Amino acid sequence: MDARQMKIKAAEAALSHVQDGMRLGIGTGSTAEEFVRLLAEKVAAGLKVEGVPTSERTARLCVELGVPLKSLDELPELDLTIDGADEVDHVLRLVKGGGGALLREKIVAAASGRMIVIADQSKVVETLGAFPLPIEINPFGQVATRIAIEKLAARSGLSGELTMRSSGDGAFMTDGGHLILDASFGRIPDAEALARELNTIPGVVEHGLFINLASLAIIAGPEGARMMQAV
């Protein structure tokens, strides 16, 4: 079973949690896109749902495949969000944002009664940090913000490069018009403390540490999908 097949297995298992009439948060990234494709098949067969996308990319795919969409302002309280992750640990702390949609993903997840994470087994880690941590920043004062993050990292005993994410024609811009610094901190021993400290830096819009948001992770491997519950 290759990586895409494992993503599809996880998405199939997540789809079993979707019920008729649900208001769904729909994530961003390659695994979430497999879920959208499967969801679209169910919608075509008569399933009634309304989705809130976490990115313009996800919105375009949903429109293309016929998944009904609303804005979060129209549906401010959601039943369930299904999204992928770049890393997930044993208590369902996550690193997200590899697809560049971390701010909207976190807003949508927080507006949901439940969040289910879907991923292949390569995303499960003992300690967060091997995947660079995305930090979304305001373009204004970006150098000052970067210095503040570097000082915070040093105080926290973290080292590693901060890399400005780029696209084909320059700096990567999020759907909200922000920049992303990818922080290669390595092992993050206290994710909660780092999350709190990052939130105190004025130029930091959001970060990719998702803590106390996911209630279930569906992890796919060669033997099929397994469930990880929040503890």
From Swiss-Prot:
The gene is rpiA. Substrate binds at T28, G29, S30, T31, D83, G84, A85, D86, K96, G97, G98, G99, K123. Keywords: Isomerase. It catalyses: aldehydo-D-ribose 5-phosphate = D-ribulose 5-phosphate. CDD domains: RPI_A (cd01398). Pathway: Carbohydrate degradation; pentose phosphate pathway; D-ribose 5-phosphate from D-ribulose 5-phosphate (non-oxidative stage): step 1/1. Pfam families: Rib_5-P_isom_A. Homodimer. This is Ribose-5-phosphate isomerase A. The keyword Isomerase applies. One of its GO terms (molecular function) is ribose-5-phosphate isomerase activity.
